[in-house]
Amino acid sequence: MAVEEKNSPTGAAMTNTGILVPSSQQSLPEWWTKTQKFFSRENTITPTFGYFRLLFGTQPGKTDIALIVIGTIAGIGAGIPFPLLGILFGELVDDLNSSTCSTTQAPPGGYQAAITTKVLQVIYVSILNFVCMYIHTGCWSMVGERLVRRLRTKYFHSLLRQEIAFTDTLPSGDVTSRLVSDIEVIQAGTSEKVGLFIGTISYFVAAYIVAFLKVATIAAMLMSVVPIYFLMAFGGGHYIKKYSGRISTHINAATSIVSSSLSHMSIVHAFNANARLEALFAQHLVSARMDALKKAITHSIQFGMLYFVAYASNALAFWQGSRMIADLAEGKPSKVSVGAVYTVIFVLLDASFVLSQMAPFMHIFASAASAGDRLMTTIKRQSAIDGTSSEGDSTISLASEEIELQDVTFNYPARPEVPVLQGVSFKIPPNKHTAIVGTSGSGKSTVVALLERLYDPITGCVRVGNRDLKEINVRHLRGSIGLVQQEPNLLDRSILENIAHGLVSSSQEKHKHLLPTLLGPSLSELTEKIRQGASEDEAVTEQGDVVREIVNLTRHAATLSNAIDFINALPDGLATRVGSSGAELSGGQKQRIALARALIRDPPVLLLDEATAALDSTSERLIQAALNKVSENVTTVSIAHRLATAKDADNIIVMQKGRVMEQGTHMDLVARDGVYAGMVRLQNIGKFSSSSSIMTESTQVDANIDRSLTTDTLLNKEEKLSLEQGVLDEKEKPAQLYMPEEADSLPTEPENEKEKPKQTLWATMKGSFPLIRPNILLISLGLITSIMIGVSYTGEAVIFGHTVGSLSVCRGGPSIRSSGMLFGLLFFILAIVKFAAVIVNGAAFGWAAEKTLYRTRVLSLRSLLRQPLEWHNADGRTPGLLVALVTSDASALSSLTGTTIGVLFSTVANLFAGVILSQCHRMEDSRSPSGYLTRIKHQKAYAKATAITVESVDNIKSIAAFSLEQEAYSVFNRSLKAPYKSNMKSVLHGNFWLSLAYSISTLVYALAYWWGSQQILAGMYTQVQFFIVLPALLFSTQSCGQMFALVPDISKARIAASNIVDLLSIKHEGDEEYDKTGSKASAKHTDPRFNMLEDKPRDVEAQLITTTPSSFPTKGMGVQFRNVHFRYPSRPNQPALDDLSINISPGQFCALVGPSGSGKSTTFALLEKFYNPASGSIIIDGVDITKQSGAAFRDTIALVPQENVMFEGTVAFNIGLGARPDVEATQEEIEEACRLANIHDTIAALPDGYNTVCSQDGKQFSGGQRQRLSIARALVRKPRLLLLDESTSALDVESEKHVQDALAKVARKTTIVAIAHRLNTIHRADRIFMIERGRCVDQGTHAELVERCESYRANVIHQSLDA
């Protein structure tokens, strides 16, 4: 249960890192602190220490201490009653034995009274057992829930404070795996199962105590096998932990592939890359599968040995007990009785049985310890640059301070062999504009990262005034800087919250009072109310004056960044959610929001890394004018490839290959005729116009006008420009084109899923059967051995009954000895049989489970990758939830072919065998009710918190740059409250039924004893019959309790199976034809959805050879848009294309230009058939693709997206993804494409060359390098139609020149359509289409449009460098 503390409104205290942590950790007893320190040590000698470190090394609070203590005491108490029952049952045996051996004809009434009294005592003890069990399962369930919540917060806290270098080297998919798989494993291993295990150990110890008190000789003999139990537990745990670590590594990589693929579905579709991604995914799964099999076999051997030792020790006990009873029967001196021997054998037999039933728990605990160690490694890691720390000088002001880099060298940790900066030295004067230009990969963005102290130099230093940057408090430093990144990352919040993030760590004193509101839920609640229909003014008034001040500051910043008009045009205005990383906005919109976020804090230092690269020239010009106005007393550092945006800088620094080549003003550098002058010549668009002198004159006039404009006048001018008004209809969302709409919003259940009726159990089973069918022989073997295991309990009962019956003193000593030896031998044989059965069972089900898991995951990913974008764009259907289908749901389903189904079948076999045995011996008490099972609801809790964590890590540079660690932490904690509260409530009623299920066996046993004893006393049944049925019923009811504990897993698997069957049941275009993700059906009746890759999938990274290299086509494609209308499904009231008509002839180089949001990228989306138009025709090579099924036409189309995407895999694999589906690109073809894209030399210089592994999104490469890799991926396809969406926006002029020359060669036999804001890249186009408001308003050559199109001419003038 949650305990609110008084230290803060959230029940937390502030640490020296500035992050809120639970205040219950304060003022703990000294002994508890010492315990924590002991278990916090990195002692990994045994899994036991790892497990205790998990429990006690995470700073549990007072409530946790109380729950652990109470739960442990109750667990110990729950284990004691049954050995006490053994004493009572032993006395009952003596009473029954005396009765049956008596010569009196009628049963004495005293025996009946004694038996009734003891049965009542049994019932009382059973009630006590239930109470103790309910308490300990409840306490430990809450301990587990609180522990995983604590681990989540600590892990997230640790991730937030780590330096960027750490996250750069973090394995792809690692965070998702930690927060989904590992947390789930930890919760399973630290909840009610701990209480059950403690109760079992208590039972085991108490049983031996009772045994020693009753018959010390037998107890001492059996005590010798106890070390073997622990040896098996710890030895097996060691190997299980070893294999779990290996599995985790492979699964992390596989999960990364799934995540990146589902996040960039348009790229997957554009290149038909699903088969190659699926194959790479399968490779990782195969590697994990072998380790999983070893883990399963290890577990089964561990389990089997525990059974063998338990049964073998019971065989010894039977034999020794029979000898003692024989001595007693022969009148030899003996202090034992039949009841005493029975008590010893009974309690030790049952204790061994229960302990063996706990063997699966050892596997769970070992896995939890292993998962805990993985989390604790990150949690305890000390950050080299802690943005949350209070250390360092927080008083220094960056205003009017000179910034200097002194002989700085640097290389990124992910690629330590590659130098990025080499002896860089330059000064940045205060209150001046310094521009940094140069080739892509020259270190420009790295300089910005060092100024923000996202990294520290390897040698040299960065100084502010006379202070080293390391001496300044990191949070204070970053709070004094406004940053606009090359690829702006926004968090999945509203526009208001994203812009207001700039105020969170502002160094301005006037913003300090806003911090509590910024960290609280007020802005989130405000935007939610607006989205629900409330007016902005009313909602703001309700929230108070501070919120109104934040809203006003936000609007002012949005005005300065030229974003206010498109914001006002959105249905929810400032309350509009931007999606994960701003996926709901276009590239230009995101840049303007990011600029507003930087400007809102009124920073003394402004860092602009390609801040206007995604904007059209008019928008860029307006923003530049606004920046000139607000940066008069600001130190501004800008990085630019468009030299027009840098020419007015006070100082321009030119960099190449990590060195400063030259610096000075624009005029000085042009006069030197050096590197910069060459860049100017390459980029100057003025020379391409016949009206160059006119443009130069116009540029000078406009420059003078711009300097005289106030911000208000500027915005009035903007409203009159038809170009910028096109932004009001900004629906094309270029970022969204390559990322499904609402792609990474926080996981919620899709509306259509909520309304869809659930599948029946039969439909689910029928749909799941094709997944299981290939493993039917393994499953059959597992089921046979499960039945053998289940029936073995009945065999045990038969042997036990005959043994107890044969130990009656009514029989002679020799008979007792021979019977004891016989049944002891039978018990030993049973031990051997069960040992073999358990091993075969574990191996068979383990291998079947892994093969089913492999098949299910690959088929699920296949189905997901084949769904159209509109399916992925459905409301609430997010990559986060879809990844769960491939990972969590597939894993849950596979449990039905693994240990869960094995235990279930052995339990059912045990139950039926016990009932049948009871009926064979005509015991009426077997018809007594044994209780009912209750289904536990399966919950997908914490998905939102996981999504927040993954999003924060993906955007960690933005989080760090704006010191949003505390804000992200606050949002994260708020997301935990609802599922935490819900789960804690479920503990109360869920554990009631669990405790009842485990305790019911004792009551059934008491009832059976009472009824059976009456039958024996009445002379209707024999002792042998009674003692056969009694343990059979006991084992059956105990197995029912264990089966009840499996109900959550079975329920989980049932839901998972339903989800997966639903997914696989979706029909796709071409199911009846060749399945490109697999192979042709082997028979006509075979469902192609279940076609599988080979058991050993092809190595897609190694298989880069083909017998016949492909060649460039001889003819390009013709393209026509005829009266096309289109609206995005998410915004049906706003047109994206409005009667668009264009005609592109085969082999032409055509360009689409126009303002941001005018519909340019939407044309590409329709050309790729990501969507179908509402009306009109799209004709490619004479075929209307809107009326054709399938997308085979994409095989000869290549796309270079605006936002460049890399997948998990080598560089060669990423480029090879672009090859046509039926061709594997050769190494020569890959290198040729890279040379054309001017990236070959960069790749060749890497230590691993083309085998260099790209992390998810290729974050170890610069923006320009990723763009060239994307171009190479498109060129390796050798397309007939090449689509370029701002394909050179991140390139320097030299790289751009190389790429343009390469495209000129390709263009001879290929149709090229380019979207561009840099007009110098398309001035040679055969035809340029001017797109505004979803229509083509003009078309012609560059020269023709300069002459007659005013808006086009204005853009040319702005980009000219002749002035």
Curated annotation (Swiss-Prot):
Keywords: ATP-binding, Cell membrane, Glycoprotein, Membrane, Nucleotide-binding, Repeat, Transmembrane, Transmembrane helix, Transport. ATP binds at residues 438-445, 1154-1161. The keyword Aminoacyl-tRNA synthetase does not apply. Signal peptide: none annotated. Induction: Expression is induced upon exposure the allylamine terbinafine and the azole itraconazole. GO terms for cellular component: mitochondrial inner membrane; plasma membrane. Its main location: membrane. The chain crosses the membrane at residues 65-85, 119-139, 193-213, 215-235, 301-321, 336-356, 781-801, 820-840, 896-916, 992-1012, 1016-1036. It is found in: Cell membrane. Residues 738-758 are annotated as: Disordered. One of its GO terms (biological process) is oligopeptide export from mitochondrion. GO terms for molecular function: ABC-type oligopeptide transporter activity; ATP binding; ATP hydrolysis activity. Glycans are attached at residues 97, 552, 633, 973. CDD domains: ABC_6TM_Pgp_ABCB1_D1_like, ABC_6TM_Pgp_ABCB1_D2_like. It is a multi-pass membrane protein. Residues 403-682, 1119-1358 form the ABC transporter domain. Residues 69-367, 781-1052 form the ABC transmembrane type-1 domain. SUPFAM superfamilies: ABC transporter transmembrane region, P-loop containing nucleoside triphosphate hydrolases. Pfam families: ABC_membrane (PF00664), ABC_tran (PF00005). Pleiotropic ABC efflux transporter that may be involved in the modulation susceptibility to a wide range of unrelated cytotoxic compounds. PANTHER family: ATP-BINDING CASSETTE TRANSPORTER, ATP-DEPENDENT PERMEASE MDL1, MITOCHONDRIAL. Belongs to the ABC transporter superfamily. ABCB family. Multidrug resistance exporter (TC 3.A.1.201) subfamily. This is ABC multidrug transporter MDR2. It comes from Trichophyton tonsurans (strain CBS 112818). The gene is MDR4.
